[in-house]
Amino acid sequence: MGIRAIVVDTAGTTTDLNFIEDVLFPYSAKALPAFLEENQNNVLVDNCICDVQDIALEPDASLARVTEILLQWIEEDRKATPLKTIQGLIWKQGYANGEFTGHIFPDFIEALDGYKQQGLRVYSFSSGSVEAQKLLFSHSDAGDLNDKFNGHFDTRTGNKRFKQAYSNIVNTISLSPKQILFVSDVLEELKAANEAGLHVVQMVRDDSQRTGDFKTIASFDELKID
């Protein structure tokens, strides 16, 4: 029973962490106060505001306080769904205005075509929202790559460091765990996916990166799927 689907992490795997940390995060932090003020009556944004109040256990938090909480979460790189949803909406404006394009490592761009030729399904799994992932890949340095993906997963699927998230992916794409390969740079994510029965490979693009006992590669050029 061979590999039929590959699931890739984004930050540090398909995309340079510096793009996330030095471009996307600061952009969302700077734009956040005005965005919330202008869009607080939007149903999706209003739902996110309510979710922030619930998570923070501050049901009566004002808009200014919610903004403060979200800015703190950005600073902490908190993987909270309402934050990731709002960031995705803010980044959508930035991409649309041409303020930046999505960084994708060239080796992954080249590999995508090969996966399609092999008949493999390709999915991404990120703590960033599905919307943010679609924006990243549709506004990439190499153009629109979204048609090369079969789907995307985010925190609504589960915490990337917990086994259940990967079991949920298995159920969603209707394959057995051993037919799925997960590639990530984060050891805890690989351990969780491995516990769920998936094949795993660690992407190590930086020599200072913490590694474990899993197979490692330095680029997608080195990933051979039979």
UniProtKB/Swiss-Prot annotation:
InterPro entries: Enolase-ppase_E1, HAD-like_sf, HAD-SF_hydro_IA, HAD_sf. Binds 1 Mg(2+) ion per subunit. GO terms for biological process: L-methionine salvage from methylthioadenosine. Its EC number is 3.1.3.77. CDD domains: HAD_EP. It catalyses: 5-methylsulfanyl-2,3-dioxopentyl phosphate + H2O = 1,2-dihydroxy-5-(methylsulfanyl)pent-1-en-3-one + phosphate. It comes from the Bacteria. Keywords: Amino-acid biosynthesis, Hydrolase, Magnesium, Metal-binding, Methionine biosynthesis. Its cofactor is Mg(2+). Pathway: Amino-acid biosynthesis; L-methionine biosynthesis via salvage pathway; L-methionine from S-methyl-5-thio-alpha-D-ribose 1-phosphate: step 3/6; Amino-acid biosynthesis; L-methionine biosynthesis via salvage pathway; L-methionine from S-methyl-5-thio-alpha-D-ribose 1-phosphate: step 4/6. The keyword Transport does not apply. Belongs to the HAD-like hydrolase superfamily. MasA/MtnC family. Monomer. This is Enolase-phosphatase E1. The gene is mtnC.
